[in-house]
Amino acid sequence: MSASASSLSAFNPKSLPLCVSRPASVSVLPPSLSFKLHSDHLVSIFASSALKCSSPAEYPSRFVRNVAVSSDFEVEEDDMFADGDDSAPVERNSFSPDLKLFVGNLSFNVDSAQLAQLFESAGNVEMVEVIYDKVTGRSRGFGFVTMSTAAEVEAAAQQFNGYEFEGRPLRVNAGPPPPKREESFSRGPRSGGYGSERGGGYGSERGGGYGSERGGGYGSERGGGYGSQRSGGGYGGSQRSSYGSGSGSGSGSGSGNRLYVGNLSWGVDDMALENLFNEQGKVVEARVIYDRDSGRSKGFGFVTLSSSQEVQKAINSLNGADLDGRQIRVSEAEARPPRGQF
């Protein structure tokens, strides 16, 4: 059973009428919701606190009057299509994947009700899900809309791809989401990131990224990662190079001229990051960090320049600058603390 499904089992369903005093408002709902639209069912709310309503007669709109509300914050694509428990209140497997649209570059203020209202003009909306981070509770800037027919899916994709909504152009793709990038992120006990011999990706058993036991990182032999205990190393580090490591003294691309770049739009990739910083100096490396399971951007990255003067110039010029609709944060990168300090 997936982590999302397990988290649902901790909640006891309660059937309650949903009502608000002002029909135009949907503020009665929590921000982290998955909406499933029906015609003749009560509202099932799964949450740790109950809503109190004096009358079931008034509803904010037809998009929220009969809604199955899930306590999930973050829903991975595999969970959306996996066979769920028979007792699960929200059946994510009830619609064909071909009827689902991916909607990206959402404003963080957009919730499922607003998205449903938008897509109504393209046809009959069956389900809307805006995905939220399960740690912060903040929207991750994307969601899914399920239509009732393939023709409506095509019409919605044509109508809304590139459509500006709440100040941001939407990215709308028809069909199921792309497969996870398992070919890029090996997860075996002796595997790792990009072409490493015994190290590699993100936290593998004997290699990998951040604070691993025996190193990892990008293309290293046994190095890489941030603050590894025995074989550390920066991106593409040598056998005993380190970036905040317990052993070794740094090589690879080094940390002295490395910048942290945060609050990136989900659509920004390595090339976009490199092009932005090319104006500030010679870019040695530009890399956006991706989630190991979903393959999606984690919203931050690192840029290495050739000199400390270029680093300061980049900070002064680009910290707070607008990139793809978001104000980026630029600062000098620091070594992450050892695992015991988290």
From Swiss-Prot:
Any one cellular-component term (Gene Ontology): ribonucleoprotein complex
Subcellular location: Plastid, Chloroplast
Disruption phenotype: No visible phenotype under normal growth conditions, but mutant plants exhibit increased sensitivity to cold stress.
One term of GO molecular function: RNA binding
Biased composition (Gly residues): 190-237, 245-255
GO biological-process terms attached to the record: cold acclimation; mRNA processing; RNA stabilization
Keywords from the named record: Chloroplast, mRNA processing, Phosphoprotein, Plastid, Repeat, Ribonucleoprotein, RNA-binding, Transit peptide
Range of the transit peptide: 1-65
Region Linker (Gly-rich): start-end pairs: 178-256
Chain residue ranges for the region called Disordered: 167-255
Domain of life: Eukaryota
CDD domains in UniProt: RRM2_NsCP33_like
Residues annotated as domain RRM: 99-177, 257-335
Pfam families: RRM_1
Main subcellular location: plastid
Phosphoserine: residues carrying this PTM: 107, 204
Function noted in UniProt: Stabilizes specific chloroplast mRNAs. Required for normal chloroplast development under cold stress conditions by stabilizing transcripts of numerous mRNAs under these conditions.
Record-linked PANTHER family: 29 KDA RIBONUCLEOPROTEIN, CHLOROPLASTIC (PTHR48025:SF24), OS02G0815200 PROTEIN (PTHR48025)
Name of the protein in its database record: 29 kDa ribonucleoprotein, chloroplastic
